[in-house]
Each structure stands twice: as structure tokens, then as C-alpha cells.
Amino acid sequence: MDKMLYLAFGLSQNYPNPFNPSTTIGFSVASEGFVSLNVYDITGRMVSTLVEGNLSTGYHSVVWNGIDNNGMSVSAGIYIYALQTETSSITRKMVFMK
């Protein structure tokens, strides 16, 4: 795999999408530092924190199982996932089906 891919900040489309019961979200971090990856419902309410902490440069992935921060299954619908660092942010949409 091309090493240049790891030098960019990026957020991949989740797969599968639509999903049930879980989906994988891949992302790349350009430099070591604080990273957060959160899931929001269509109204903008944060429903799940998937990553929150310092990560090394490179490619990372996380699996979301449709469970919110309170341990409850979320409703079917469209969700936004947002990757943020100290200097950059990017969002994408995903669909949870029941």
C-alpha cells in the first residue's frame, strides 16, 4: 500500500452502508495528537463517542454497533459521523436500518 495514504487526514465512508447490526468506519490521521470521532443524529444531538484521545499518525478503524452512549440501541435513520483533530474536521452520513 502506498505510504503517502497515511500522511493525509481523511474519513472513509462507513461499510456496510446501510448497516445492521454494525458498521466499520476507517480514518487517517496526518499527525499524532488528539482525535475525536462522534456520531450524531439528524438533529445534531451527539449519540455516541467512538474515539476520544491521542492517536498516532496513520490509518485507524472502529466498529459502531448502533449503541448510544447510554447503552441503548439507536433508532433506524440517518446519522452523521464526525472526525475532529485540533486543526481539521470532516463529516459523513450513514444509515442505520432495523
Language-model regions: role of each:
Residues R45:
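Conserved Rossmann-like nucleotide-cofactor binding loop
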Residues V51-T87:
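Short, surface-exposed loop/turn motifs with a glycine/proline- and acidic-biased composition
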Residues S88-R92:
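Extracellular and select intracellular beta-sandwich modules with Ser/Thr-enriched
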Residues M94-K98:
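Short beta-strand edge segments in extracellular beta-sheet folds
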